[in-house]
């Protein structure tokens, strides 16, 4: 289902990214605000060049996208790992709970294997119950809890 994004997909990705970012702004107004563009042309081109941005289509319509990064973890006291980080994922709001997200995650898993990654990793806000449940159904487990204190 996933394919590399092309320049012509920019506005569709922007529209989808705004759906997700609106939730981030709602949950963490101390961190997020809605910019004029989440994917200005330069950023979009950079993500395409780095082969990090993928889209999902239904017919000719972009219905989802993912932004992936690969991180090699190594250092003193660390097991060498190659982790594919799922930085952003979105399925069009009106098409959620129809299996498209699961299909996208299956494709991400296949990409991770192709890139010889040892793990898939993502972050999700705990108040996003729907997403937490979805990721758990896809086989993800909670590995850490991030904490913060206002100064």
What is the role of each PLM region?
Residues 55, 61-70, 85, 90:
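Conserved beta-strand in the GNAT
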Residues 79-93, 123, 148:
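Conserved acetyl-CoA binding element of GNAT-fold acetyltransferases
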Residues 95, 99-107:
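Conserved acetyl-CoA pyrophosphate-binding loop and the N-cap/start of the following alpha-helix
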């Amino acid at each position: 289902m996933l394919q590399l994004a092309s320049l012509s997909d920019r506005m569709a990705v922007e529209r989808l990214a705004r759906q997700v970012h609106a939730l981030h702004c709602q949950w963490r107004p101390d961190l997020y605000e809605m910019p004029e563009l989440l994917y200005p042309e330069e950023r979009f081109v950079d993500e395409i060049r780095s082969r990090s941005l993928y889209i999902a289509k239904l017919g000719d319509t972009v219905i989802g996208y993912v932004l992936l990064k690969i991180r090699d973890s190594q250092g003193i006291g660390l097991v060498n790992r190659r982790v594919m980080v799922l930085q952003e994922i979105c399925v069009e709001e009106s098409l959620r709970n129809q299996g498209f997200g699961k299909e996208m995650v299956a494709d991400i898993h296949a990409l991770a294997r192709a890139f010889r990654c040892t793990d898939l990793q993502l972050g999700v806000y705990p108040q996003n119950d729907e997403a937490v449940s979805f990721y758990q159904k896809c086989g993800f487990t909670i590995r850490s809890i991030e904490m913060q204190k206002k100064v």
